[in-house]
Amino acid sequence: MGLFDKKYCDVCGERIGLLGNRKLEDGNLCKDCARKLSPWFSERRNSSVNEIKRQLEYREENRGRVEVFHITRTLGSGTKLLLDEDAGLFMVTSAKNIAEANPDVLALSDVTGCTLDVEENSKELLHEDKDGNEVSYNPPRYEYSYDFYIIVNVNNPYFNEMRFRINPNSVEISPPPSIRPGVTLRFNPETNAEYKKYKQLGEEIRQILVKVRDDAREKIEQAAAPKTAVSCPYCGATTTPDASGCCEYCGGALMG
């Protein structure tokens, strides 16, 4: 088969335009079908046609979960972590039109871990000497930039990590020069207000997500635990508490 022979998508059957082919392990995928895959999915080249078809079915079912998602808490700016604490669900998205973006809706109980990753990059600052050459300072001086990422580890058939940046722009810091030639000063980014702001935000997101994850798991464990019959203090009946912890006969609260 030649380089410019006609190719067709093995998922939807449509003809694939020039430069529109996305290779699969055993076939071809058009860019429109590829666009529907989860944004957290990175194993397309190692996936079979059937595996991609199953994921697209999952993604279509996900639209229904997005429709009924009720946001109870929003964490972050730009890319946001959205919680539906009543249903024990969450999503991560930067989209303004959530229905159109169709972000993956996951159970909080499927979170296996959450960390804050602070990424540092440095660039040496140079100056011109008397001959017009760019040379290092003595001691060398650097400009630093920082980005703050939340990494959420999850149980999901199509991806196991969601990594997103919580600062819209890199935090850039240029430490002041040393007042003593040849002596390098210790630099602490924690003294920078913007750095502290995003580090605190990242820690807050991490702590809240772990807390609501633990709460969701506790609810699941309680619901699965065998119920013990008790005597209702309101109607006197021997009853097994319902899902709300109430008497199955009179509706009186038995727990709380």
For the regions a protein language model found, what residue spans apply to each?
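Phosphoinositide-binding peripheral membrane targeting modules
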Residues: D86-V135
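Acidic, Ser/Thr- and proline-rich intrinsically disordered linker/docking segments
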Residues: C114-P226
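Residues immediately within or flanking Cys/His clusters that coordinate Zn2+
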Residues: F4-C9, G27, A229, S244
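Short cysteine-rich clusters marking metal-coordination/redox-active sites
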Residues: C9-C12, C30-C33, C232-C235, C247-C250
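Short recognition patches in nucleic-acid-associated and regulatory proteins
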Residues: L3-K23
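Anionic N-terminal interaction surfaces
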Residues: N28, R35-D104
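Cys/His-rich microdomains that often coordinate metals
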Residues: G13-G17, L29, A34-L37, T239, ...
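Short linker/helix segments within small regulatory modules
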Residues: L19-N28, T240-C246
